[in-house]
Amino acid sequence: MNQELTNNPFNPLTPPKVFDEIKVSLASPERILSWSYGEIKKPETINYRTFKPERDGLFCARIFGPIKDYECLCGKYKRMKYRGVVCEKCGVEVTLQKVRRERMGHIELAAPVAHIWFLKSLPSRIGLMLDMTLRDLERILYFENYVVTEPGLTDLTYGQLMTEEEFMDAQDQYGMDAFTANIGAEAIREMLSQIDLEAEAEQLRADLAEATGELKPKKIIKRLKVVESFLESGNRPEWMVLTVIPVIPPELRPLVPLDGGRFATSDLNDLYRRVINRNNRLKRLIELRAPDIIVRNEKRMLQESVDALFDNGRRGRVITGANKRPLKSLSDMLKGKQGRFRQNLLGKRVDFSGRSVIVTGPELKLHQCGLPKKMALELFKPFIYSRLEAKGLSSTVKQAKKLVEKERPEVWDILDEVIREHPVLLNRAPTLHRLGIQAFEPILIEGKAIQLHPLVCSAFNADFDGDQMAVHVPLSLEAQLEARVLMMSTNNVLSPANGAPIIVPSQDMILGLYYLTLEREGMVGEGKIFGSIDEVQHALDAGEVHLHTKITARIAQIDDEGNEVLKRVETTPGRVRLGALLPMNNKAPFELVNRLLRKKEVQQVIDTVYRYCGQKESVIFCDQIMTMGFREAFKAGISFGKDDMVIPDDKWGIVDETRDQVKDFEQQYMDGLITQGEKYNKVVDAWSKCNDRVTEAMMSTISADKRDENGAVMEPNSVYMMAHSGARGSVTQMKQLGGMRGLMAKPNGDIIETPIISNFKEGLTVLEYFNSTHGARKGLSDTALKTANSGYLTRRLVDVAQDCIVREHDCGTDRGVTAEAAVNDGEVVASLAERVLGRVAADDILRPGTEEVLVAAGQLIDERMADAIHEAGVQTSRVRSPLTCESEEGVCAMCYGRDLARGTMVNQGEAVGIIAAQSIGEPGTQLTMRTFHIGGVAQGGQQSFQEANQDGTITFENPQLLLNASGESLVMGRNMKLLIKDAQGEERASFKLGYGSKLFVKDGAQIKRGDKLFEWDPYTLPIIAEKAGTAKYVDLVSGIAVRDETDEATGMTQKIVIDWRAAPKGSDLKPEIILVDSDGEPVRNDAGNPVHYPMSVDAILSIEDGQVIEAGDVIARIPREGAKTKDITGGLPRVAELFEARRPKDHAIIAEIDGYVRFGRDYKNKRRISIEPSNEAMEPVEYMVPKGKHIPVQEGDFVQKGDYIMDGNPAPHDILSILGVEALANYMVKEVQEVYRLQGVKINDKHIEVIVRQMLQKWEISDSGDTTLLKGEHVDKQEFDAANEKTIARGGRPASGEPILLGITKASLQTRSFISAASFQETTRVLTEASVQGKKDKLVGLKENVIVGRLIPAGTGGATQQMRHIATQRDNVVIAARREEAEAAAALAAPIMDADIVDDDFDTLVDTPESRD
């Protein structure tokens, strides 16, 4: 089943070593000696005159093997016949030179040395074993302090540190032999070897049972974990201190002579030389009985040199070479992008590949690419040689080579034969998703550029401005088969991210199809009637009708029974021509193209054709509409000049009007009616509205029908056609050319108040030009930075999801998630039908109000079912989801549902995790590259009211209203909702009403679309009086809690609450406003509590002390953040923040239980809020809220589990622990989708769910019960269940725990496979941990298998793996049967014969997993 590790050079027929898992553990000195072929005693490398390796040196041939194949060093024994002989003169074994890559040596150290990984890699393993701090350990190891290892009868303690003087004093005081204290690694080694692991573990468990407090149990648990891992893995603690150092084979640290007598060498040789030099010097000093201080210094230097060899720069100064460059240590060889893992094991270079510039190949078929002859000749050389020999045109390879070099005509004929039906792979970097590599059939072309089919450009994200692509040749038959069946461009019509076609015409083709399907009144031949498509074509050619004429034609259609019928349709000749290309199918009627086709519609047409007419038809159709699109665009001759950019006549009127408005605002500000911030917001708003109006005026001017002298409608404006069709450009760009450029943003995202009124046609003034440079430059720098960020996000996503593979058909779970339409701001952004499409139903989906089953449980919901669900008006339904899948490894096909790129149920072995990661990561890069297209134009404009988006009846949920003095109803509740219901009483839209909103409708009112429902102040959050009374300031001390701010510009004063905690006397103030009645008694609310309003920092007070107020008056206003520009800048980091599960800075506090709010006492800068549960049995829950933060709940309010006590973004961990997995998934999907939707990118929810599933793999143990699990430990769900099953079987108490959410980086580092984690990040830390625990890697994910050089267990690799598995099982059965037969026969033949011998004979016949134990 599995491939080799190394082959024996003498016996190539020995079976390769087969392995199922890889284990890493500490190497004992004995183990190191068993690997070694001899000790290296000298630091010499090679003799600079003879270039022969020095004996006993770092390249010694006696230890590591000969330098030339089958030849000893002195030349006495040469050639094969002596192989295996050891030469008596030079001591070299005669064998292959290759053994110099595998034989290791060793260095015997004169003094033990601590391994820096186990010392410095936090948490320090040696420190945990000895219960000492890292600083103390370093003092001992680097010879600063002594440590007591055996106190004897003195009053010293074990493990006590002493300085040299203290040590001397103690010796004088207690005598030399009364105690032992030691220094250096010897002391540490001695202490480690004295540890009895079992006793230590017992002791720690006992301590843990007694320990109280916060820190103590944590520390004990940490130590216990390390002790347990040593016990389980069979490692000994003293092996963390080395007495022998292994030396890696010389070929892996080569020394190469350069010309001019110099040598290039690997840094490792320098590091080893240092170690050997110091070690030899130390040996000599010990023999000479040198003074203690000298020996000690030498030992310290030895320790430092070994540290540098293992991990240079981890401790102390970096050891540098001759050129002041740090030397690359063993750790550096593994780490980072250039390290062994990422450079050589995960990223390999490929032979049989070439690259060249791409040009467009519009005459190619979709499955073809043009390959330059020169390139093909070079790439297919081996195939050509073999054909030449087979045909007898050459007898040797050399001859064939000559023929090919001369490029004889027969060579080209043979190349044609070879290439036919042999697909090649094309790849464009960066390969962001799997469509970045596709297979094509090569067509030989002249020239030197690769021709690419225009329709696949969007999949490769390629354009023809000098992009290059690489060509790879699949060599083996299997590779060719996979290229043809799985990777052919014709098999990749749909995008795996959202299931929409990705083979879609763009740019010119769209323009051509748009022009083709235009319809204009009054064109020549209007109203004519034609009998067939051919007649229409004839009339067109004769010039009797125009492409855009309105005509009637008879068109052949397929009806529902499948018969061909002729239908009369009103259409245009252009559309008739397009309709002629449609495949005949009743699901693809002529109506599909009988409309103006823009980009979206074209995509829809292709989608429909693909879904209902099959792949072959749709590929042919795509090719045909591509050709037609290009041809029509060329015939239409659309181009534009400067006069096509029309400046609307009323532009200046609108601008002047806005200028007056802005003057008004300035005046109001001067009079002190509004604050600086409000003025700014209003001005920005006014200008963005002005901008929109100018844009509308421009668009209506451009898109208006113009007629010529004959009354025929003229062709639309060219620029308008390009933007409207979706070919190129957008309204934003057009408005900058012909309207006004609009508001600009500063680099920090603030909007500049003065807009750019000119457009590019008029030209900008110098000041306007200067203002616009900010945004443009920011756009460019953003692009450069974000590409890297996006790539890193993709890498983390791939890493966390790489082992998520479809492993089985059905896991049999009955769980699922509830799907409903995605609503954003009262607008349905994704209907229920869209969201359940391609999922498996978890329960029967019924038609509302009846028992009719639309979809049975366990059925895959396809387009037809989804339409039925939509028409029936189903509101919610339960579907299976990868989140709730109960497969042991990976997910099951039923929970995943449809494979988006194929449109059918997902296959087993599909790597859905990687597809999810690519689907989420790929648009990240796309979006970041797109920020600067609008050139930093701000898209401001705050919405301050809500209009009804449909007719219906109003109902309120949780209403809390208050009528103010002028009779307006104000919303006083925090979680009030307004619903619009249709005639059937089904909810059609819902809006959250913010506190302080003004309502314009009554409960139960009938409304029309476009009615104003409610409005709010977008810039400030009001605090509203709920009762009438006299306002009284409490603790609002001027200068400490309130500052009178006088505006220079207006001379008006207003009171603003400032941070009172900063003031010396302010820490115990509680600034608030209370209401008193005429007697001075506090006014009480309905619950009987006094009415008081705590003030938060930056609030603006709207009333004076002692002012009489009515219910509904505004007491204070809290400013909201101003309008920042939104682009994906907010987006990418937001996505990363969500997937990393970071806690947002000011995160919301979520109520954990239902209950009543009580305010506790205040502290210096926090206030305590507790929730008294409505259920008496539960404990109250307390929260600390920073003072000065706005708290939306009042004393005595009833809150439900999941309500916010403090505003902000919720932390995903809280959602998980309080509301559960499904709520978390909904939150993540909603938030991630929001970011992508803003950019118009569609991603299927499934992908996000797969990633969230990977983030939820671990459980945190909250109570260990009688299991071996420790409290606070993070374990996999499977481990958790297994441990509990074991304990329950023994009759013990099971452990309890809850799922925890890990960010993607953490989750990748905590995967069960240490190989995969090590190749991701923090390589040394991962490997240190793995080796202490003696971890086994079962090689289940993709990454581990790539690293050990196997086929991945997904796709075809997974299938072959299963076949091999089944085969070995069958073999085992047969072998067992044979063994029994043989034993029976032997027992009959010779009853005295020992059974063991028979066993052994049979073991060697077949190598099976069983016989490998």
Swiss-Prot record:
GO biological process: one example: DNA-templated transcription
The record's free-text note on cofactor binding: Binds 1 Mg(2+) ion per subunit.
Broad enzyme group: transferase
InterPro entries with a match to the protein in the record: DNA-dir_RpoC_beta_prime, DNA-dir_RpoC_beta_prime_bact, RNA_pol_asu, RNA_pol_N, RNA_pol_Rpb1_1, RNA_pol_Rpb1_3, RNA_pol_Rpb1_3_sf, RNA_pol_Rpb1_4
GO CC terms of this entry: DNA-directed RNA polymerase complex
Annotated residues for binding of Zn(2+) 1: 72, 74, 87, 90
Gene Ontology molecular function, alphabetical: DNA binding; DNA-directed RNA polymerase activity; magnesium ion binding; zinc ion binding
Positions that bind Zn(2+) 2: 811, 885, 892, 895
Keyword Kinase in record: no
Family: Belongs to the RNA polymerase beta' chain family.
Purpose of the protein: DNA-dependent RNA polymerase catalyzes the transcription of DNA into RNA using the four ribonucleoside triphosphates as substrates.
Protein name: DNA-directed RNA polymerase subunit beta'
Species of origin: Ruegeria pomeroyi (strain ATCC 700808 / DSM 15171 / DSS-3)
